[in-house]
From Swiss-Prot:
GO terms for biological process: 1-deoxy-D-xylulose 5-phosphate biosynthetic process; isopentenyl diphosphate biosynthetic process, methylerythritol 4-phosphate pathway; terpenoid biosynthetic process; thiamine biosynthetic process. This is 1-deoxy-D-xylulose-5-phosphate synthase. Its EC number is 2.2.1.7. Transmembrane segments: none annotated.
């Protein structure tokens, strides 16, 4: 028997759906999500939590002309299913497949690309003001989670939208979580709002009862004069109201009928309005309901993308977290900072072991960097653990608040290089380039997980900014000997060879070693150098390579522009190097989603491609 979902492909198909059929459809969508995402991998919990919310939005608004912006965008699966992309879910987040985030080049229904948090209100406000200036008529809807609302950019946008009274609809999807449990004053404030629902319901009932008689109306009028003076004490929604944004809620984000009623009316409200919906992350799937963080993002059931060697011990994140705990036992001034990512960055155990020395600031990378700077200025040794893609949000603070003052802040940059399935917005391929241009910044990269403890210890002891970059997952080559001693600006000759030297940093060193094994079978034996320091480079070793007549190949999991290879090339040019040189990395383009192995192969950074590049030197 054909399901209801099979007959629905576009927003117009939902318009005449009865309430009972909509309930049936919500169950079918959940089943589809569980079955499909379990096969391909992807964001599950967040999408299970917004099924009814998405259906109600699509029934109440006309997204042929109305525009919607999904904050972060990982919760847009239901919207994608019902905008003609259901069949694409078999290739979700795969190379050349359906994106896990909104993409303007994927569908006319995706009005703005997202991937990072807290951008939706700003983007929606920009669209609304463009609409007004052009004299057009449509509604702009921004959907933002309670976690993303803690981001400073979202609050800046709220301040602006309320000041100008621009007409737009903001949906607060409050599931009481971001990826991990939310923290901070705004999170407590939203809890207060949820608890205030009883008060709001009572207030409505009183007004309805009193308003039925003339005496009651007169009493309401007199009460309102008193109400204004005490309103801020008893109605927590005044936070939004004082910013000039009308607040409605909280309402049940799984009650389609209630949401339809509210959404149909807000289109007529002049000025901005925020509708507070309360949802349950992972709803309809018991495992995800119990552990929403665990099922936030899940791997494919037949996961073959794990290019790291399963025999290798720990992931880089785990190795970092364990090392920091050990160092903190000896160094009492060491503190750890995260921006809403304690689990992903490996700090969960540190938070349990040293709760008073652990600081989760919420989705606030700018604040996290300057918080670390303030701590360092007052004698602490802060370590900020952050994904490469998210550190770029604190770019100015790294320069202005850390590097100019030459403060001893350690940046533990996780997910450096290609991360795979999340695509352009999450690849960590730019940190070397923008950090390299900052005076006083040192950049290092461990060649294996075993090297993290000594490198982290060295970074914390150095009395200036240090960035340690390392990839997602585990090692590809196990049992590499960790450096016994780290010497500032010095590289390591890992394997001697002839004629050509491969200089690689981080995980790319492991690719270089595998490429050497391939080349040995063809009679070529390259020298392998581990660029432990990306900044500064080892000028003495480069001068020796010049004197010994080596050709040079550099490999990095970063864009070429501003990267390690360019730094090496500049110095070789300065010393009149006249050998052959080739730079491997990513060109001036954004790297799409896909299996990590496929992406390395596509961009010439897998061991086979590296060996083929070297063969061309000899042909």
């Amino acid at each position: 028997m054909k399901s209801l979902l099979d007959s629905l492909n576009f927003p117009k198909d939902l318009k005449n759906l009865s309430d009972s059929d909509t309930e049936i459809l919500s169950k079918e969508i959940r089943q589809f999500l569980i079955e499909s995402v379990s096969k391909t991998g992807g964001h599950l919990s967040s999408n299970l939590g917004v099924v009814e919310l998405t259906l109600s939005l699509m029934k109440s608004f006309d997204f042929e002309k109305d525009k919607i912006v999904w904050d972060v965008g990982h919760q847009s699966y239901v919207y994608k299913i019902l905008t003609g992309r259901k069949d694409g879910f078999k290739n979700l987040r795969q190379f050349n497949g359906l994106s896990g985030f909104p993409k303007r080049n994927e569908s006319k229904y995706d009005y703005f690309d997202t991937g990072h948090s807290s951008t939706s209100i700003s983007a929606g406000l920009g669209m609304a003001r463009a609409r007004d200036l052009k004299g057009e008529k449509y509604t702009v809807v921004s959907v933002i989670g309670d976690g993303a609302l803690t981001g400073g950019m979202a609050l800046e946008a709220l301040n602006d939208v309320g000041f100008r009274k621009t007409k737009m609809v903001i949906i607060l999807n409050d599931n009481q979580m971001s990826i991990s449990v939310n923290v901070g004053g705004l999170s407590r404030y939203l809890n207060k709002l949820r608890m205030g629902e009883t008060y709001n319901r009572l207030k409505t009932n009183i007004n309805t009862s009193l308003g039925s008689s003339d005496l009651g109306k007169d009493l309401i009028s007199k009460m309102s004069k008193v109400k204004d003076s005490i309103k801020q004490l008893v109605v927590p929604s005044m936070f939004f109201e004082n910013m000039g944004v009308k607040y409605i809620g909280p309402i049940d984000g799984h009650d389609i009928k209630a949401m339809n009623e509210v959404f149909s009316k807000v289109k007529d409200i002049e000025g901005p309005v925020i509708i507070h919906t309360v949802t349950q992350k992972g709803r309809g799937y018991s495992l995800a309901e119990k552990s929403p963080s665990k099922y936030h993002g899940i791997p494919p059931s037949n996961d073959k993308k794990e290019e790291p060697n399963k025999a290798c011990r720990d992931s880089y994140s785990k190795a970092f977290g364990n090392a920091l705990i050990d160092i903190a036992k000896e160094e009492k001034e060491v503190v750890a900072i995260t921006a809403a990512m304690p689990d992903g960055t490996g700090l969960k155990d540190f938070a349990t072991t040293y709760p008073e020395r652990f600081f989760d600031v919420g989705i606030a990378e700018q604040h996290a960097v300057t918080l670390a700077a303030g701590m360092a200025a007052n004698g602490l040794k802060p370590v900020f653990a952050v994904y490469s893609t998210f550190l770029q949000r604190g770019f100015d603070q790294v320069i202005h608040d850390v590097c100019i003052q030459d403060l001893p802040v350690t940046f533990a940059i996780d997910r450096a290089g290609i991360v795979g399935d999340d695509g352009e917005t999450h690849q960590g391929i730019m940190d070397v380039s923008y950090l390299s241009m900052m005076p006083n910044m040192t950049i290092v990269a461990p060649k294996c997980t075993e090297e993290i403890p000594s490198m982290l210890r060295w970074a914390i002891k150095k009395n200036s900014p240090v960035a340690i970059r390392y990839p997602r997952g585990k090692d590809i080559v196990c049992n590499l000997d960790a450096l016994q001693e780290i010497s500032y600006g010095k590289w390591e000759v890992v394997s001697e060879g002839k004629k050509i030297c491969i200089i690689a940093s981080g995980r790319m060193l492991q690719h270089a070693l595998l490429a050497k094994e391939i080349l040995k079978e063809k009679g070529i034996d390259p020298k392998i150098v581990n660029a432990t320091f990306i900044k500064p480079i080892d000028k003495c070793l480069l001068e020796n390579l010049k004197e010994d007549g080596y050709d040079i190949l550099t490999i990095e999991d970063n864009i070429i522009c501003g990267g390690l290879g360019i730094s090496i090339l500049e110095y070789l040019n300065y010393i009149d190097y006249n050998g052959n040189m080739k730079l491997l990395g990513y060109n001036d383009e954004f790297i799409p989603q896909g299996n990590v192995e496929i992406l390395y192969r596509t961009y010439g950074l897998d061991p086979v491609s590296i060996s083929n590049t070297i063969l061309k030197f000899y042909n």
